[in-house]
Structures are given as structure tokens and as C-alpha cells.
Regions:
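Glycine-rich phosphate-binding P-loop
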Residues: 133-144
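P-loop NTP-binding catalytic core
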Residues: 58-62, 66-133
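N-terminal accessory targeting/assembly segments
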Residues: 1-84
Length: 144
């Protein structure tokens, strides 16, 4: 069972990992298919029986704290952020208004991306900017 990650989802109780798997990066929930856990190396394992469409809908409602309209801006971007920095990508039919996505309907899948620390990922950047006595740096860029 996924309990150490403290995902605020009742559906997490259905997810089981039968073999050791460290560094889980994603949990993919898809209607009519088993959920899949993916670790930071890209290894995938089936970790539940298939989720029904109603279980996916219930999970989505729970992710939105049963107030989907409160998360409309995030949903329009295709994801919802959970406490702890975890993000849930939404797969469904986009509803557009004036060429802009407003929301999703017929949600068929959720991709839970587990927030995790990557130690040392900025060591080179840090030494490059701060070795000469620079005291502040602003780094801006388009999200990947």
C-alpha cells in the first residue's frame, strides 16, 4: 500500500506494490486498466486491479476536495497540485471556450507525479554563480 507518501486519497489504499520499488515518481490511474507505478529510473510495475470510471471520477473529486469549481484555473492547465507539492495530471476531454481550455469532462485517467528531492542537481549552477562573491541570482525560464 502507498502510505509512506501520505497521498491524501482514499484510492491510495487500492494501490499495492508487490515487489520492492524505490523512488516512485508517478502513479498512473486509468479507467478500465490497472494502475502503474513508475520509479525515477523509468521502471514500471502494475500496482492495482483496474480502476473503474466511477473510481477515477471519485478520485478526481477527492483531489479537488469535492469542490471542482475551486480548482478551475489549475484544471484548465491540465493538473491539480496537492499538499506536499505532488501534482495530478488530468486526462479527459477538454472543454474549450473561445479557443481556451476551461475544464475537462469525461476524465479517464489521472497521473499522480510524486514530488521528490534531487540532491545535488544545482551544485554546478550554485558554484558557477556564487563562487565569485555574487550574492543573488534570479533564474527565470519556461517550464519544461
Amino acid at each position: 500500500m502507498i502510505s509512506t507518501m501520505k497521498l491524501p486519497l482514499k484510492s491510495a489504499a487500492k494501490i499495492r506494490i508487490t515487489e520492492p520499488m524505490s523512488g516512485i515518481a508517478e502513479i498512473r490511474l486509468r479507467a478500465g486498466r490497472p494502475s502503474v507505478c513508475v520509479n525515477i529510473l523509468g521502471d514500471m510495475r502494475i500496482c492495482s486491479d483496474p480502476f473503474s470510471a466511477s473510481e477515477i471520477a471519485d478520485c478526481f473529486a477527492e483531489i479537488c476536495r469535492y469542490s471542482v469549481h475551486s480548482f478551475q484555473e489549475e484544471i484548465a492547465q491540465g493538473f491539480v497540485t496537492l499538499d506536499g507539492g505532488h501534482r495530478v495530471g488530468i486526462c479527459g476531454t477538454a472543454v474549450k471556450n473561445g479557443g481556451k481550455i476551461e475544464m475537462f469532462k469525461d476524465i479517464s485517467g489521472l497521473n499522480i507525479r510524486i514530488a521528490h528531492e534531487i540532491k545535488g542537481c544545482a551544485d554546478e549552477v550554485y558554484s558557477r554563480f556564487f563562487s565569485g562573491g555574487t550574492r543573488s541570482v534570479l533564474i527565470a525560464g519556461k517550464p519544461l
